[in-house]
Amino acid sequence: MSYTYLITGATSDVGRALIERLLQNAPADTLVLAQGCGDLEKLADLCARFPGQVRPFDVDLSDRAKVDTFVQVLASSAPAPTHFIHL
Protein backbone atom coordinates (compact mmCIF):
# COMPACT_ATOMS: atom_id res chain seq x y z
CA MET A 1 0.00 0.00 0.00
CA SER A 2 1.31 3.44 -0.86
CA TYR A 3 0.99 6.38 1.50
CA THR A 4 0.33 10.03 0.75
CA TYR A 5 0.94 12.51 3.55
CA LEU A 6 -0.52 16.02 3.47
CA ILE A 7 1.58 18.11 5.84
CA THR A 8 0.60 21.69 6.59
CA GLY A 9 3.37 23.78 8.08
CA ALA A 10 5.86 21.56 6.28
CA THR A 11 8.46 24.33 6.01
CA SER A 12 8.84 24.58 9.79
CA ASP A 13 11.81 22.91 11.47
CA VAL A 14 9.50 20.21 12.81
CA GLY A 15 7.86 19.78 9.40
CA ARG A 16 11.15 19.34 7.59
CA ALA A 17 12.42 16.88 10.19
CA LEU A 18 9.16 14.93 9.94
CA ILE A 19 9.37 14.74 6.14
CA GLU A 20 12.95 13.51 6.34
CA ARG A 21 12.02 10.88 8.93
CA LEU A 22 9.00 9.70 6.92
CA LEU A 23 10.94 9.32 3.68
CA GLN A 24 14.26 7.93 4.93
CA ASN A 25 13.20 4.30 4.61
CA ALA A 26 9.89 4.69 2.83
CA PRO A 27 8.95 2.90 -0.38
CA ALA A 28 9.53 4.95 -3.54
CA ASP A 29 5.78 5.46 -4.02
CA THR A 30 5.41 7.35 -0.71
CA LEU A 31 4.40 10.95 -1.41
CA VAL A 32 4.47 14.05 0.77
CA LEU A 33 2.26 16.99 -0.19
CA ALA A 34 4.08 19.76 1.66
CA GLN A 35 2.31 23.05 2.36
CA GLY A 36 4.22 26.20 3.21
CA CYS A 37 3.51 29.91 2.88
CA GLY A 38 6.08 32.04 1.09
CA ASP A 39 9.04 29.96 2.24
CA LEU A 40 9.16 26.91 -0.01
CA GLU A 41 12.91 27.35 -0.53
CA LYS A 42 13.25 25.65 2.86
CA LEU A 43 12.08 22.43 1.19
CA ALA A 44 14.60 22.53 -1.68
CA ASP A 45 17.06 20.16 -0.03
CA LEU A 46 14.34 17.59 0.68
CA CYS A 47 13.00 17.86 -2.87
CA ALA A 48 16.53 17.19 -4.15
CA ARG A 49 17.17 14.29 -1.75
CA PHE A 50 13.80 12.63 -2.37
CA PRO A 51 13.00 13.42 -6.02
CA GLY A 52 9.36 12.93 -6.92
CA GLN A 53 8.38 12.21 -3.32
CA VAL A 54 7.99 15.79 -2.04
CA ARG A 55 5.53 18.11 -3.77
CA PRO A 56 5.65 21.61 -2.29
CA PHE A 57 2.63 23.91 -2.34
CA ASP A 58 2.71 27.62 -1.48
CA VAL A 59 -0.66 28.30 0.16
CA ASP A 60 -1.81 30.86 2.71
CA LEU A 61 -4.23 28.80 4.79
CA SER A 62 -5.78 31.94 6.29
CA ASP A 63 -7.19 32.88 2.85
CA ARG A 64 -10.36 30.89 2.09
CA ALA A 65 -10.12 31.41 -1.69
CA LYS A 66 -6.53 30.15 -1.75
CA VAL A 67 -7.50 27.13 0.34
CA ASP A 68 -10.34 26.33 -2.08
CA THR A 69 -7.91 26.56 -5.01
CA PHE A 70 -5.40 24.38 -3.14
CA VAL A 71 -8.04 21.70 -2.56
CA GLN A 72 -9.01 21.76 -6.25
CA VAL A 73 -5.36 21.45 -7.32
CA LEU A 74 -4.82 18.54 -4.94
CA ALA A 75 -7.97 16.79 -6.13
CA SER A 76 -6.89 17.01 -9.76
CA SER A 77 -3.15 16.35 -9.45
CA ALA A 78 -2.42 14.12 -6.46
CA PRO A 79 -3.69 10.94 -4.86
CA ALA A 80 -6.03 11.40 -1.93
CA PRO A 81 -4.02 11.78 1.28
CA THR A 82 -3.92 8.72 3.50
CA HIS A 83 -2.55 10.82 6.37
CA PHE A 84 -3.02 14.48 7.36
CA ILE A 85 -0.56 16.23 9.67
CA HIS A 86 -1.18 19.83 10.73
CA LEU A 87 1.77 21.61 12.33
Predicted regions and their residues:
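Rossmann-fold scaffold of SDR-type NAD(P)-dependent oxidoreductases
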Residues: 8, 81-87
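Rossmann-fold cofactor-recognition segment
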Residues: 47-65
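Conserved Rossmann-fold cofactor-binding substructure of NAD(P)-dependent oxidoreductases
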Residues: 62-77
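Conserved Rossmann-like nucleotide-binding pocket used by diverse enzymes
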Residues: 6, 33, 57
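Extreme N-terminal starter segment of soluble prokaryotic enzymes
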Residues: 2-4
